[in-house]
Amino acid sequence: MIDFPASPTLNQIFTVGTASWRWDGAKWVAYGSGGSYIIAFDIPGVLTLNAVFAHVFAAAAAFPLHFGGSQARGSANATGSPVVTFARSAAASPLSFSNIGTMTITAGTTNPTFITASPPSFVTGDTIRGLVTTGDVSFADLYLTLAGTR
């Protein structure tokens, strides 16, 4: 018998052995069993303030806390610490975005740090947007892969 938590929070992940479930707000749903959902972005040139990139979800997808397993790099080290802020819009209100996390490139490197308050999840038609909220004069050619599950 599996003893699920009595008062789960939205998108909470519960694991027993090698199986995991995610609380969708109403029920526990098998997590990670539906296959991968990979999003890739390639933003050429210097990472300038207010550059925008986005993806509209063709299927429901969930991502680990802090976009665990996701990767990013560039072709030139950052002088400062550029920041990309990620936001979500629901399919029903595609122009209304709420921030869900950030990616910061450490100064002097091309190494990212992803931060989210909770594991992000999306339904079909939702949008994830990346907005450069702190640009950098030398970091260039951002390539980014967000790794989630269906």
Outline where the language-model segments fall.
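Noncatalytic modules at the cell exterior or secretory-pathway interfaces
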Residues: 119-134
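A short beta-strand element within beta-rich, extracytoplasmic domains
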Residues: 64-76
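Exposed aromatic-hydrophobic patches
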Residues: 110-119
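Extracellular/surface-exposed low-complexity repeats and stalk/linker segments enriched in Gly/Pro
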Residues: 1-18, 29
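Short beta-strands within extracellular/lumenal beta-sheet-rich domains
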Residues: 47-61
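Short, charged beta-turn/beta-strand-edge "cap" motif at the junction between a beta-strand
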Residues: 19-21, 134-137
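Glycine-rich, low-complexity segments
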Residues: 1-4, 24-51, 75-77, 81-83, ...
